[in-house]
């Protein structure tokens, strides 16, 4: 039960082990105890960690926005008979955000400390303060998803096979002729006995098997004669083709979904930007939904036009796509020396370069083409961003001059200025800094608000294209799966080794 002792202990004799709340190693005992009291009646946290919550909000769905900072719990909700990822605020003392675990949820780990998945409304990202807690959280969530998928696939395999045709018609047929014609009446007939059928002796000696052999073969029936009398179609009757139109093949099969090994490059780019995984492409129902969406939008040609239209936005591979991903917020320096920005919202695109001390506002306000020459590979240390983020603000008009002046160092990075440590973080490790953010509470939520809102304004046309529309379709699909699986989960979603407490 919530609020119980931390850790686990075995139950009484003959009873299964009683599950207990799992605390966070970064929180103090009284903070963990307060967190357990917020879980609710008969709710257990199977994994607890200190995180920042990032969301890719629907208007653009291309940029991460920091929403909350607190303790995330993987909750086993016995009254609802389901699992939830819930974020609690220790300062506010309440639930800040939650996402129910549905069957087709894909829990991805672009980095060991930043995990992403598709929520009911948008893409969500968890930035963990401790990688050990992140690893334990990921292992538990993926284990539950795998068990649920295996159980559903097992139910599909247990469906009864299609009924086979009955052999009633054969029972009324004649048995095969005896091997020895004209045999003795007392002789054992070979053919009928081999089939287990009752035999009747023929009393008329004139009727023998030789008479049956001499019968002529039956001639064609009148119906066959009528069919043979029909006029055959010759080549002269076949007209020339008309209305020919070349239609590109999308590579979708109703049974197996999309062929992920032979996908068109433009389709692969579209799916990657929309955050669609290979498991969703090979799922029959999900791939059918994606295929119908592509056909409604104009087929493969429309996808190619959309990709060509967005082609100039991302720069060449060296800058690692800094052009269309500049407003991404940086991450807090980890306890294991990690540095760099958050991964992009669309899964599959290479993560952006580390956070340098270049001028974030010019890179954000200007058009996407200017940032490409920037390498963005310098300044990987977390301390420089908060201190040097202010000076470069005056020179937004001349972004080109900085690159030639000092090579790779002051190059304007394609990263957002909304730095999380701006609220007074210590430059020392991310563990203490993130804990300070949690204890400060709501004040930190306001720091990225104004810059991030302005960052979402520049790319309206690209975000509302096929990529944004497809992401909305997949979000509706996840909500539909969530609602349809709710009844099934309540009916029989108990794991083999996990029983719900009533």
Swiss-Prot record:
<dbReference type="GO" id="GO:0006952">
    <property type="term" value="P:defense response"/>
</dbReference>
<dbReference type="GO" id="GO:0003779">
    <property type="term" value="F:actin binding"/>
</dbReference>
<dbReference type="GO" id="GO:0017124">
    <property type="term" value="F:SH3 domain binding"/>
</dbReference>
<dbReference type="GO" id="GO:0042110">
    <property type="term" value="P:T cell activation"/>
</dbReference>
<dbReference type="GO" id="GO:0016197">
    <property type="term" value="P:endosomal transport"/>
</dbReference>
<dbReference type="InterPro" id="IPR000697">
    <property type="entry name" value="WH1/EVH1_dom"/>
</dbReference>
<dbReference type="Pfam" id="PF02205">
    <property type="entry name" value="WH2"/>
</dbReference>
<dbReference type="Pfam" id="PF00786">
    <property type="entry name" value="PBD"/>
</dbReference>
<dbReference type="GO" id="GO:1905168">
    <property type="term" value="P:positive regulation of double-strand break repair via homologous recombination"/>
</dbReference>
<feature type="domain" description="WH1">
    <location>
        <begin position="39"/>
        <end position="148"/>
    </location>
</feature>
<dbReference type="GO" id="GO:0032488">
    <property type="term" value="P:Cdc42 protein signal transduction"/>
</dbReference>
<dbReference type="GO" id="GO:0005884">
    <property type="term" value="C:actin filament"/>
</dbReference>
<dbReference type="GO" id="GO:0012506">
    <property type="term" value="C:vesicle membrane"/>
</dbReference>
<feature type="compositionally biased region" description="Polar residues">
    <location>
        <begin position="201"/>
        <end position="211"/>
    </location>
</feature>
<feature type="domain" description="CRIB">
    <location>
        <begin position="238"/>
        <end position="251"/>
    </location>
</feature>
<feature type="modified residue" description="Phosphoserine; by CK2">
    <location>
        <position position="484"/>
    </location>
</feature>
<dbReference type="GO" id="GO:0031267">
    <property type="term" value="F:small GTPase binding"/>
</dbReference>
<dbReference type="GO" id="GO:0051497">
    <property type="term" value="P:negative regulation of stress fiber assembly"/>
</dbReference>
<comment type="subunit">
    <text>(Microbial infection) Interacts with E.coli effector protein EspF(U).</text>
</comment>
<dbReference type="InterPro" id="IPR011026">
    <property type="entry name" value="WAS_C"/>
</dbReference>
<feature type="repeat" description="GRSGPLPPXP motif 1">
    <location>
        <begin position="337"/>
        <end position="346"/>
    </location>
</feature>
<dbReference type="InterPro" id="IPR003124">
    <property type="entry name" value="WH2_dom"/>
</dbReference>
<dbReference type="InterPro" id="IPR036936">
    <property type="entry name" value="CRIB_dom_sf"/>
</dbReference>
<dbReference type="GO" id="GO:0008544">
    <property type="term" value="P:epidermis development"/>
</dbReference>
<keyword id="KW-0597">Phosphoprotein</keyword>
<feature type="compositionally biased region" description="Pro residues">
    <location>
        <begin position="341"/>
        <end position="419"/>
    </location>
</feature>
<feature type="modified residue" description="Phosphoserine">
    <location>
        <position position="221"/>
    </location>
</feature>
<dbReference type="GO" id="GO:0051492">
    <property type="term" value="P:regulation of stress fiber assembly"/>
</dbReference>
<dbReference type="GO" id="GO:0005634">
    <property type="term" value="C:nucleus"/>
</dbReference>
<dbReference type="GO" id="GO:0019901">
    <property type="term" value="F:protein kinase binding"/>
</dbReference>
<feature type="region of interest" description="Disordered">
    <location>
        <begin position="307"/>
        <end position="502"/>
    </location>
</feature>
<comment type="function">
    <text>Effector protein for Rho-type GTPases that regulates actin filament reorganization via its interaction with the Arp2/3 complex. Important for efficient actin polymerization. Possible regulator of lymphocyte and platelet function. Mediates actin filament reorganization and the formation of actin pedestals upon infection by pathogenic bacteria. In addition to its role in the cytoplasmic cytoskeleton, also promotes actin polymerization in the nucleus, thereby regulating gene transcription and repair of damaged DNA.</text>
</comment>
<protein>
    <recommendedName>
        <fullName>Actin nucleation-promoting factor WAS</fullName>
    </recommendedName>
</protein>
<dbReference type="GO" id="GO:0065003">
    <property type="term" value="P:protein-containing complex assembly"/>
</dbReference>
<dbReference type="GO" id="GO:0030041">
    <property type="term" value="P:actin filament polymerization"/>
</dbReference>
<feature type="compositionally biased region" description="Acidic residues">
    <location>
        <begin position="486"/>
        <end position="502"/>
    </location>
</feature>
<keyword id="KW-0677">Repeat</keyword>
<feature type="repeat" description="GRSGPLPPXP motif 2">
    <location>
        <begin position="376"/>
        <end position="385"/>
    </location>
</feature>
<dbReference type="GO" id="GO:0045944">
    <property type="term" value="P:positive regulation of transcription by RNA polymerase II"/>
</dbReference>
<dbReference type="GO" id="GO:0030695">
    <property type="term" value="F:GTPase regulator activity"/>
</dbReference>
<dbReference type="GO" id="GO:0071346">
    <property type="term" value="P:cellular response to type II interferon"/>
</dbReference>
<dbReference type="Pfam" id="PF00568">
    <property type="entry name" value="WH1"/>
</dbReference>
């Amino acid at each position: 039960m919530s609020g119980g002792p931390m850790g686990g202990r075995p139950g009484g004799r003959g009873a299964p082990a009683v599950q207990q709340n799992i605390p966070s190693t970064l929180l103090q005992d009284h903070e963990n105890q307060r967190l357990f009291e917020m879980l609710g009646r008969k709710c257990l946290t199977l994994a607890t960690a200190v995180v920042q919550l990032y969301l890719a909000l629907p208007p653009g769905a291309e940029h991460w926005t920091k929403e909350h900072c607190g303790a995330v719990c993987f909750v086993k909700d016995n009254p609802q008979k389901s699992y939830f990822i819930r974020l609690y605020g220790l300062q506010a003392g309440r639930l800040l955000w939650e996402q129910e675990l549905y069957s087709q949820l894909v829990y991805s780990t672009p980095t060991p400390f930043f995990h992403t998945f598709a929520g009911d409304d948008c893409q969500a990202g968890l930035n963990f303060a401790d990688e050990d807690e992140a690893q334990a959280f990921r292992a538990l969530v993926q284990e539950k998803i795998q068990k649920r998928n295996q159980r559903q696939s097992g139910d599909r395999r247990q469906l009864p096979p299609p009924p086979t045709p009955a052999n009633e018609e054969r029972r009324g047929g004649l048995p095969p002729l005896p091997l020895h014609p004209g045999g003795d009446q007392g002789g054992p007939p070979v053919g009928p006995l081999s089939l287990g059928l009752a035999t009747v002796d023929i009393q008329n000696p004139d009727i023998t098997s030789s008479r049956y052999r001499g019968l002529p073969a039956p001639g064609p029936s009148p119906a066959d004669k009528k069919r043979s009398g029909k006029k055959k179609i010759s080549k002269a009757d076949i007209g020339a083709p008309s209305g020919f139109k070349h239609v590109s093949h999308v590579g979708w099969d109703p049974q197996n979904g999309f062929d992920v090994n032979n996908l068109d490059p433009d389709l692969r780019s579209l799916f990657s930007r929309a955050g669609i995984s290979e498991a969703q492409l090979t799922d029959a129902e999900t791939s059918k939904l994606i295929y119908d969406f592509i056909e409604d939008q104009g087929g493969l040609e429309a996808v190619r036009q959309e990709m060509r239209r967005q082609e100039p936005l991302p720069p060449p591979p060296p800058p690692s796509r800094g052009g269309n991903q500049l407003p991404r917020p940086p991450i807090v320096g980890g306890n294991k020396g990690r540095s760099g920005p958050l991964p992009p919202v669309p899964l599959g695109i290479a993560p952006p370069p580390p956070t340098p001390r270049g001028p974030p506002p010019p890179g954000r306000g200007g058009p996407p083409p200017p940032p490409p020459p920037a390498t963005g590979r310098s300044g990987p240390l977390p301390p420089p961003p908060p201190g040097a983020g202010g000076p470069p603000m005056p020179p937004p008009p001349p972004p080109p001059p900085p690159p030639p002046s000092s090579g790779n160092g002051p190059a304007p990075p394609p990263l957002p200025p909304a730095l999380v440590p701006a609220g007074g973080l210590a430059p020392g490790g991310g563990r203490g800094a993130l804990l300070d953010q949690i204890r400060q509470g709501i004040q930190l939520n306001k720091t990225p608000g104004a810059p991030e809102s302005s960052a979402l304004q520049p790319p309206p046309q690209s975000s509302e294209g096929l990529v944004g529309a497809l992401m909305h379709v997949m979000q509706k699909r996840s909500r539909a799966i969530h609602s349809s699986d709710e009844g099934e989960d309540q009916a029989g979603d108990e794991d083999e080794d996990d029983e719900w407490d009533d």
